[in-house]
Amino acid sequence: MEETSVAGDPGPDAGTSTAPNAAPEPVARRQRILFVGEAATLAHVVRPFVLARSLDPSRYEVHFACDPRFNKLLGPLPFPHHPIHTVPSEEVLLKIAQGRLFYNTRTLRKYIAADRKILNEIAPDVVVGDNRLSLSVSARLAGIPYIAIANAYWSPQARRRFPLPDVPWTRFFGVRPVSILYRLYRPLIFALYCLPLNWLRRKHGLSSLGWDLCRIFTDGDYTLYADVPELVPTYNLPANHRYLGPVLWSPDVKPPTWWHSLPTDRPIIYATLGSSGGKNLLQVVLNALGRFTRDGDRGHRWPEPPEERAGQRLRRGLPAGRSGCSALRRGALQRRQPDDAAGVGGRGAGDRAPQQHGPALEHGGP
């Protein structure tokens, strides 16, 4: 029997028919996120780079801004890159070693102008910055939510102390007198380092962050710590401060030509100072490792000098892929700053880990 429809009855095929002029469903706009890395050291570039690369491009429109000095290590970028200026790494590290202001008012003023230009051009929904202190001003002036990436060592709620730095004063006056003066004057030294950013914040109508240097390095609408609480414990963290965990990265490079010539019958120690490690520390590290590089039975060192194998970066997992290989690394700049900056820090010892933790220690803070 032929089916018919009556008034008020849509009929069996009505639900599957489409009106020719029906408007298509609106496609959800991708969130636009700008990642900004401060290229004073490699760590502050690769951490936002790794996070940016981890986002689903079908859901997020990602932009990446940094000084291009480390781009050759990053490889092809899967998103637009926007070059911004960062003061030379050597200049920043020298100022830190000398206890001088690493970012003065003039530098931060230039940074803020560059930030505002790129924020206006991209108009992101969120900006994520790693050690780009000027975003504390520029993002707020643009009305854009700001997520700061930092090390938990810098958290105002971190359970840690600031050790005496290895500075020339200790050679002239002795460790004990300088230690006493350091404990007395450290809060004042830290306060001096807060002056440039606080002055610029007030100039732009923003409130001061106070005189705790830890607040300067962790200010953000949200703050993500690239650490785990077991490494740097904290107490009473604000709701907008979270542990992100280690951000792992390594350059995609081939192993050096000598890698497969290393002995397989003895443990291997892979030492890396990171991009912020002082070159003068390399021999200190090698001397300290001397007892590990001796053959216990024959009492001699490995024949090939360690210096001939220095200066090359290894792909993540390569050292750990060798049986009995351990990693020894120097902390990244953010771990050093409370120690070295303002004459407020020391020569940090490396972290030694068993084989399975090698990649994390090697690349958690390049």
Swiss-Prot record:
For the region Disordered, what residue ranges are annotated? Answer: 1-23, 295-366
* Record family assignment: Belongs to the UDP-glycosyltransferase family.
What's the protein called, per UniProt? Answer: Inactive PGL/p-HBAD biosynthesis glycosyltransferase BCG_2979c
Basic and acidic residues bias: where? Answer: 295-311
- Which SUPFAM superfamilies does the record associate with it? UDP-Glycosyltransferase/glycogen phosphorylase (SSF53756)
